[in-house]
C-alpha cells in the first residue's frame, strides 16, 4: 500500500530560513511561488526578462535572472518545460550548485533519462502536484490542496525527504496528501498515462469514433456530440466515483453496451500494444526520439500538430462550441482564475 503524508505529519521548519528559487513562472511556477510565499517561505523567482519577469514582479514576488536566483538560493525548483531544462541547467544553474544545496523538479524526465546529472553533494528530489497550476493555486486559496507525489533521487544532506515534504506542505499538496514514489516510477507512469490513455489513447479513440459515424453517413455535428462533447460527462462521473459510479449513473442500455461492445474495441491486442508503448518508455526509446526531435527543430511534431488542427472534428467542434456559450464561460473562468491567483 502506498505511503501518504499529510500536513500533520510534516514539520516545515527544516525549510524555513532557506531561500527557495522557483525557475519559471508559468502555470506551475506562479502557483508554487505564490503558495510558498503565502505559507511564509523565502521565495525568489528566476526567469528571463520579458512577460513572465514582469508578471512575477507585478505579483509582488522577488524576481531575478535564473543565474542570480540559483546563486542565492538554497533550494532550486526547476519548473520549465522538459525540453528546455537541460540547456538552462547547464548554463545558469549548475555553476551555482554548491555542496549542500537542493535541486528540485516536478517531473523526473531529465534526471531519469540522464539529461541532467547533478553533482553528488547536492540533494535531488521532486514534488509534483497532480493537477494544473491554476487548480493548485485555487485549491490553496480555498484552504484545500491538490494531492501530489514526491521522490528522492539523492540525499546528500540527510534532509532531502524532510525538505521535500516541507515543500509539499508549503504549496498545499500535503492538505490533499503526498504519495511517496521514485523518479523512475513517476516518470514512466506519467509518460505512459499521457501516451496510452489520457492524450494519445483518448484522442485517437475519439477521432476514430467520429470518422466511423461520418463515413457511415451521419451528420458530423451529431458525430461530434456523441464521440467528443459527451465524453466530459462520462469522465466527470468516473473522476467523482470511479467506473462503478459512471455505470450506475448512465442508462441500463448504455451500461449493457459498455459490457458487450467495449471489449470488442479495447481488446487484448490493444493491451499488447500498450505494453509495447510502455517498453519504449522504459528502455528510453521514447525519450531519445523526443530529444532528437527537439534537436532537429521539431519537424514531425509540427507536422502532427498541423494535421490534428486541420481535422474535420476541429472545424465542426469550433462551430458547435459557438452555439454553447457556457463552454466559453468555463474556459474564460480558468483564464480569470490564473490571472486572479497570480494577483492575490
From Swiss-Prot:
Domain of life, source organism: Bacteria
Protein role: Involved in the biosynthesis of branched-chain amino acids (BCAA). Catalyzes an alkyl-migration followed by a ketol-acid reduction of (S)-2-acetolactate (S2AL) to yield (R)-2,3-dihydroxy-isovalerate. In the isomerase reaction, S2AL is rearranged via a Mg-dependent methyl migration to produce 3-hydroxy-3-methyl-2-ketobutyrate (HMKB). In the reductase reaction, this 2-ketoacid undergoes a metal-dependent reduction by NADPH to yield (R)-2,3-dihydroxy-isovalerate.
Catalytic activity: (2R)-2,3-dihydroxy-3-methylbutanoate + NADP(+) = (2S)-2-acetolactate + NADPH + H(+); (2R,3R)-2,3-dihydroxy-3-methylpentanoate + NADP(+) = (S)-2-ethyl-2-hydroxy-3-oxobutanoate + NADPH + H(+)
Cofactors that this protein relies on: Mg(2+)
Coiled-coil zones: none
Enzyme Commission code: 1.1.1.86
Top-rank EC class of the record's enzyme: oxidoreductase
Protein name as catalogued: Ketol-acid reductoisomerase (NADP(+))
Amino acid at each position: 500500500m502506498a505511503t501518504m503524508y499529510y500536513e500533520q505529519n510534516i514539520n516545515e521548519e527544516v525549510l524555513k530560513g532557506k531561500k527557495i528559487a522557483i525557475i519559471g513562472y508559468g502555470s506551475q511556477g506562479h502557483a508554487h511561488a505564490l503558495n510558498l510565499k503565502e505559507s511564509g517561505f523565502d521565495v525568489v523567482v528566476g526567469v528571463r526578462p520579458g512577460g513572465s519577469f514582469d508578471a512575477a514582479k507585478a505579483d509582488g514576488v522577488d524576481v531575478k535572472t535564473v543565474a542570480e536566483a540559483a546563486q542565492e538560493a538554497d533550494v532550486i525548483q526547476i519548473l520549465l518545460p522538459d525540453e528546455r531544462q537541460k540547456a538552462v541547467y547547464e548554463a545558469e544553474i549548475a555553476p551555482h550548485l554548491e555542496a549542500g544545496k537542493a535541486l528540485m523538479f516536478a517531473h523526473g524526465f531529465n534526471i531519469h533519462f540522464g539529461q541532467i546529472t547533478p553533482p553528488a553533494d547536492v540533494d535531488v528530489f521532486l514534488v509534483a502536484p497532480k493537477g494544473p497550476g491554476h487548480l493548485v493555486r485555487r485549491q490553496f486559496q480555498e484552504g484545500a490542496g491538490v494531492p501530489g507525489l514526491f521522490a528522492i533521487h539523492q540525499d546528500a544532506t540527510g534532509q532531502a525527504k524532510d525538505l521535500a515534504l516541507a515543500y509539499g506542505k508549503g504549496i498545499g499538496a500535503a492538505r490533499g496528501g503526498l504519495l511517496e514514489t521514485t523518479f523512475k516510477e513517476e516518470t514512466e507512469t506519467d509518460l505512459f498515462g499521457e501516451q496510452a490513455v489520457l492524450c494519445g489513447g483518448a484522442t485517437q479513440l475519439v477521432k476514430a469514433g467520429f470518422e466511423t459515424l461520418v463515413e457511415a453517413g451521419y451528420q458530423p455535428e451529431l458525430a461530434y456530440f456523441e464521440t467528443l462533447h459527451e465524453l466530459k460527462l462520462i469522465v466527470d462521473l468516473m473522476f467523482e466515483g470511479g467506473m462503478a459510479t459512471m455505470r450506475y449513473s448512465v442508462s441500463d442500455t448504455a451500461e449493457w453496451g459498455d459490457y458487450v461492445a467495449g471489449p470488442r474495441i479495447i481488446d487484448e491486442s490493444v493491451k499488447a500494444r500498450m505494453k509495447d508503448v510502455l517498453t519504449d518508455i522504459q528502455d528510453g526509446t521514447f525519450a531519445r526520439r523526443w530529444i532528437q526531435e527537439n534537436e532537429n527543430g521539431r519537424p514531425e511534431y509540427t507536422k502532427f500538430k498541423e494535421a490534428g488542427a486541420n481535422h474535420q472534428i476541429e472545424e465542426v467542434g469550433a462551430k458547435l462550441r459557438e452555439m454553447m456559450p457556457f463552454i466559453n464561460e468555463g474556459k474564460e473562468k480558468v483564464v480569470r482564475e490564473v490571472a486572479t491567483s497570480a494577483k492575490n
